[in-house]
Amino acid sequence: MDIEDEENMSSSSIDVKENRNLDNMPPKDSSTPGPGEGIPLSNGGGGSTSRKRPLEEGSNGHSKYRLKKRRKTPGPVLPKNALMQLNEIKPGLQYMLLSQTGPVHAPLFVMSVEVNGQVFEGSGPTKKKAKLHAAEKALRSFVQFPNASEAHLAMGRTLSVNTDFTSDQADFPDTLFNGFETPDKSEPPFYVGSNGDDSFSSSGDVSLSASPVPASLTQPPLPIPPPFPPPSGKNPVMILNELRPGLKYDFLSESGESHAKSFVMSVVVDGQFFEGSGRNKKLAKARAAQSALATVFNLHLDQTPSRQPVLSEGLQLHLPQVLADAVSRLVLGKFSDLTDNFSSPHARRKVLSGVVMTTGTDVKDAKVISVSTGTKCINGEYMSDRGLALNDCHAEIISRRSLLRFLYAQLELYLNNKEDQKKSIFQKSERGGFRLKDTVQFHLYISTSPCGDARIFSPHEPVLEGMAPDSHQLTEPADRHPNRKARGQLRTKIESGEGTIPVRSNASIQTWDGVLQGERLLTMSCSDKIARWNVVGIQGALLSIFVEPIYFSSIILGSLYHGDHLSRAMYQRISNIEDLPPLYTLNKPLLSGISNAEARQPGKAPNFSVNWTVGDTAIEVINATTGKDELGRPSRLCKHALYCRWMRVHGKVPPHLLRTKITKPTTYHESKLAAKEYQAAKARLFTAFIKAGLGAWVEKPTEQDQFSFTP
């Protein structure tokens, strides 16, 4: 018998004892001998002096009569370990023994399991424990964080019933389970009382164990009680101090103008570094503590479903919240470097955006590709018919244009020589042209929700989602109709201003002379443009002649995150789209907020926009009203500049590597029309908006694109 079998026998016998339902056992009679008091009962053999077993009531006088065992009333469902949870989520997984090392009395086993194309390894003194550790790692790849019962204990066991993504069970079954560890056996189980009030008792119907039971296996649920606040008004700093006494908080930086200061505090917990920012040091300290509680102890103080990440349908290589916080931190850090720790006059901004690239599962290897700011669009009188002015200087639009420069640079790197091909993010596609390497992903960060449909909601009504202000009684949800007719509408930005308005039915075509005579130049909202990228890709029409469609893997918001509204704006409202060309799809990226939401940026928005792409030595500052820099020079991101890059790459790519065969084009407009699959996908997108009753896409005057290449 090997070590594993011995342990299995031992653990199974212990499990039987622990699982015995003591509540169903009759109370001990005073006449019944206690342990060590009675004489051993006879086994039926002769010579025993033990007394006979008394006849039981209802035995019909037969000594060997046995009562039928009563069916035990099912007690509370015991918490499931990681192995059990993973088996329910992904049944039929095969665990492989990779190695066995160490002496006989202290062996070390390494087991592996493949889940979603990834291999996870676990080690332990027995095969069983090694399998358990492998299962935990696998679960962590798509479930947010492991459970920590000590955090719940510090909260006085007042757990919120919303400790997992229950609102998304139908759409995301993989996120049903948050816990990997069973609670401490010394802790009695606590349950919400069946009367639905806030009291706790040791019996009831709704289990608050770390591993929720799938709805299909339980009785009809009772009314959900309201979320519980931290006991005795404990704030994150107090709760963290109970879990890890004596922590030291460090003041890292102070930035911003006098009326809009931003402080950054940090704390180290269990070797992990956490930052928090806020308008004062106290708030920054609390946010640092809150971030630590969420990451280390799986203790989330804001558990409303709308604040939870909306998982992607594609390959998820990273833990959602870890990725979101890392992307935010990287973009803010790069912007700080570029603006001398926010001291530069051009550090002023309302919205900050950036694109981060990951090339594997470790977010430590992530790289900032672009950073930008801005909230305004060009004034109609400054339109350029040579592609020399930027029409839209909103931060997220500028970040994506900066990303295009990086993609051109990577294509040129691949085309240089064979040595550089390994350094490029592109590789040849078996379908013709180029495609991204498998592990390369791009993540879009925006410091607030994009203007347009994603921002049309009231972030503070009511105070708690599903609760009336100043009340502990459940009311109607905060937004009963997140998809009502007013939602999802295409919207346009206001020229030389902020905010958006719904498109008019007759405004789909704009004319050059009409705009010059005083008609407002209309630009589609950022929500609408990002929804467009989720269909046609972020590479645009020109690059699609060389590369397969590229999509964002995640969209991270620094503030004003609401999962329902953001997912509707990004892709749900066009879920009726059909007949897309090959390789084009309706992309559904990860959507997430960050642990420490950015403070609102009060005051008037600056009239400039800054941009930076990896490889640049400094930021470029553009006047958003004119679409050019202060000296009247065109931006490195303008249509003409990017068209020059495209022509240069087009001259280097062998004809057989083009995804679309194209003769030498004469104008920018003709070059874009040559990308026939891209244009077909765009047409399907516009049709989907119209069929859904959301309005017609408004395009710029065609004269803007009728320019030729001039080196």
From Swiss-Prot:
Residue ranges of region Interaction with substrate RNA? 83-88, 104-105, 237-242, 259
Q: Which terms in the GO cellular component ontology are assigned?
A: cytoplasm; nucleolus; nucleoplasm; nucleus; synapse
Tissue expression from the record: Brain and peripheral tissues.
Where in this protein does the record say Phosphoserine is found? S149
Q: What is the effect of changing M238A?
A: Strongly reduced RNA editing activity
Question: What keywords is this UniProt entry annotated with?
Answer: Hydrolase, Metal-binding, mRNA processing, Nucleus, Phosphoprotein, Repeat, RNA-binding, Zinc
Q: Kindly list the places in or outside the cell where this protein is found, as annotated in its UniProt entry.
A: Nucleus; Nucleus, Nucleolus
Active site location: E396 (proton donor)
Which Gene3D superfamilies does this one have?
A: 3.30.160.20
Q: What cofactor does this one take?
A: 1D-myo-inositol hexakisphosphate
What Gene Ontology molecular-function terms does this entry list?
Answer: double-stranded RNA adenosine deaminase activity; double-stranded RNA binding; identical protein binding; metal ion binding; RNA binding; tRNA-specific adenosine deaminase activity
Residue ranges, annotated region (Disordered): 1-79, 176-220
Q: What is its EC number?
A: 3.5.4.37
Keyword set includes Methyltransferase:
no
Q: Quick one: which residues bind Zn(2+)?
A: H394, C451, C526
Domain DRBM per the UniProt entry, residue ranges: 78-144, 231-298
Which InterPro entries is this protein grouped with?
Answer: A_deamin, ADAR2_DSRM_1, ADAR2_DSRM_2, dsRBD_dom
Substrates-to-products reaction catalysed: adenosine in double-stranded RNA + H2O + H(+) = inosine in double-stranded RNA + NH4(+)
Q: Where is the composition biased (Low complexity)?
A: 192-213
Complexes and interactors: Homodimer. Homodimerization is essential for its catalytic activity. Can form heterodimers with isoform 5 of ADAR/ADAR1.
**What is the stated purpose of this protein?**
Catalyzes the hydrolytic deamination of adenosine to inosine in double-stranded RNA (dsRNA) referred to as A-to-I RNA editing.
What is this protein identified as?
Answer: Double-stranded RNA-specific editase 1
